[in-house]
Amino acid sequence: MKLGVNIDHVAVLREARAVNDPQIIHAMFEAVSGGADQITIHLREDRRHINEDDVKNIINLSPIPVNLECSINSEIIDIVCELKPHRATIVPEKREELTTEGGLSLDSLNLKNVISKLNDNDIKVSLFINPKKNDVIMSKELGATCVELHTGAYANTFLMLNSNLNHTKYKIDNLNLKRGELEILLNSELTRIKEAANISTNLGLEVAAGHGLNYQNVTAISSIKDIFELNIGQSIVAKSVFVGLKNAVKEMMELVK
């Protein structure tokens, strides 16, 4: 199992004061020192954290592959084609969201053209999708070589079942259920991910997973044999506040491997 470390939240901290501290390149090298297999970053249309200079510097200096998350916005795709990361993961994007809220809608008329353009520029293409059979099949038909399964529903259910989240202002209202119901739902979400991963592998797609994964919930996902890579960010950066980024990555690597 490989670990992609998303360092977007280091850039979020930098932008909180609009100064060049902490430096994103320093974060990249700390993640590498901790054993990361890949650096993941998201160049959003609103540039709320990562910007073009960050992307260029990380791609040029990273000793490990760079996975660049992006929307299908034409300006963004042109930047991706120019900078040529190892992989481009196409994600849905809404300006009002705090983070990516769900998998891609695969019925966009422009999506196939974007995938073709990225392939023509020798960039591996992954689609960030919900763990559904039809989405996996469509991803293959559209020309993707990889899918990243959205683990947000699993992660949210796990949190509501196994933490005090329900007693905070961050509780998830639609998951305000009895423990027995949450346990059934958690098993259902895990089964959905396993089945989607298996279908993907059978179709010849590489399978990654991510969103909301942390030190408590990652083991069940990392044990799925059809998944070859996990992309994890916020929980690692949060842990790094107390133990340092290198050590935070090391701890996650121990769980993932």
Curated annotation (Swiss-Prot):
EC number(s): the record gives: 2.6.99.2
**CDD domains in the record:** PNPsynthase
Q: Does the keyword Transferase apply?
A: yes
Active-site residues are: H42, E69, H211
Q: Where in the cell is it found?
A: Cytoplasm
Write the record's keywords in alphabetical order, separated by commas.
Answer: Cytoplasm, Pyridoxine biosynthesis, Transferase
Entry binding sites for 3-amino-2-oxopropyl phosphate:
N6, R17, G212, G233, Q234
The molecular function terms of the Gene Ontology recorded here are:
pyridoxine 5'-phosphate synthase activity
Q: What is its main location?
A: cytoplasm
InterPro entries in alphabetical order: Aldolase_TIM, PyrdxlP_synth_PdxJ, Pyridoxine-5'_phos_synth
What pathway does the annotation place this protein in?
A: Cofactor biosynthesis; pyridoxine 5'-phosphate biosynthesis; pyridoxine 5'-phosphate from D-erythrose 4-phosphate: step 5/5
Reactions the enzyme catalyzes: 3-amino-2-oxopropyl phosphate + 1-deoxy-D-xylulose 5-phosphate = pyridoxine 5'-phosphate + phosphate + 2 H2O + H(+)
Where does the chain bind 1-deoxy-D-xylulose 5-phosphate?
D8, H9, R44, H49, T99
Q: Where is this site: Transition state stabilizer?
A: E148
Q: Which Pfam families match?
A: PdxJ
A Gene Ontology term for the protein's cellular component = cytosol
- From its record, what is one biological process in GO terms? pyridoxine biosynthetic process
Job of this protein:
Catalyzes the complicated ring closure reaction between the two acyclic compounds 1-deoxy-D-xylulose-5-phosphate (DXP) and 3-amino-2-oxopropyl phosphate (1-amino-acetone-3-phosphate or AAP) to form pyridoxine 5'-phosphate (PNP) and inorganic phosphate.
Task: Supply the PANTHER family for this chain.
Answer: PYRIDOXINE 5'-PHOSPHATE SYNTHASE (PTHR30456:SF0)
Give the family this protein belongs to, as stated in its UniProt record: Belongs to the PNP synthase family.
Q: HAMAP family annotated for this entry? A: PdxJ (MF_00279)
Q: Which NCBIfam families does the protein's record reference?
A: pdxJ (TIGR00559), PRK05265.1-3 (NF003625), PRK05265.1-5 (NF003627)
Subunit details:
Homooctamer; tetramer of dimers.
* Name of the protein this chain belongs to: Pyridoxine 5'-phosphate synthase
- Species: Campylobacter fetus subsp. fetus (strain 82-40)
The gene name on file is: pdxJ
